[in-house]
Amino acid sequence: MDLSPNPDSPPSGGGNGGGGGSSSSNSSPSMGAGAPQSPSRYEAQKRRDWNTFGQYLRNHRPPLSLAQCSGAHVLEFLRYLDQFGKTKVHTAACPFFGHPSPPAPCPCPLRQAWGSLDALVGRLRAAFEENGGRPESNPFAARAVRLYLREVREHQARARGVSYEKKKRKKPQQQQLQGGDSSGLHGHQHHPPPPPPAGAAC
């Protein structure tokens, strides 16, 4: 079995020799009307993931066709990928359980990070339909797969002491648009004081 899947290394670009050059070719859109454009990093990673999954199905005992593949097989594939993970996930018995920055090494297992699995499933869900699969029978969109990903996220958040909640974006402050009157720039525009009353004149 000669599989070397690496779903949590899309940013590195180490696996494809031309990863660094593809981003520079996208920076000059005026050149490429007739020239073949190299696939984006996402498309290249999606193709690699799809090939890895296809190889997994072929090496399965018994071998599976894509039509036979179910959500249960996807879960089996995701668990299989854990052996290639690089993320330390502390067990409940570990003294560093829940610590985001443990001060010393521990024997806890390495797993695939939740974010890597979530992105992988998204790419494979798209690739399944691009390769002729019907959306209603997409095993990567199965409820069991969604529940598994949610379970992994919650477990890793507790074990690693990190939060996977999305950060709320701050709204732009309205004072910069409205509150210019209090700034020193408008200090010279004060109205002159009213003239003294007529009876006050000598």
UniProtKB/Swiss-Prot annotation:
Q: Where is the composition biased (Gly residues)?
A: 12-22
Cellular localization per UniProt: Nucleus
Q: Where is the ALOG domain?
A: 41-168
Hey, which family's this protein in?
Belongs to the plant homeotic and developmental regulators ALOG protein family.
| Domain of life assignment | Eukaryota
PANTHER family membership: PROTEIN G1-LIKE2, PROTEIN G1-LIKE3
Q: Which UniProt keywords apply?
A: Developmental protein, DNA-binding, Nucleus, Transcription, Transcription regulation
Pro residues: compositionally biased ranges: 192-202
Segments carrying motif Nuclear localization signal:
166-170
Q: Name one GO cellular component term.
A: nucleus
A Pfam family hit: ALOG_dom
Q: Which InterPro entries match?
A: ALOG, ALOG_dom
- Name listed for the protein in its UniProt record: Protein G1-like4
Q: Which GO terms describe its molecular function?
A: DNA binding
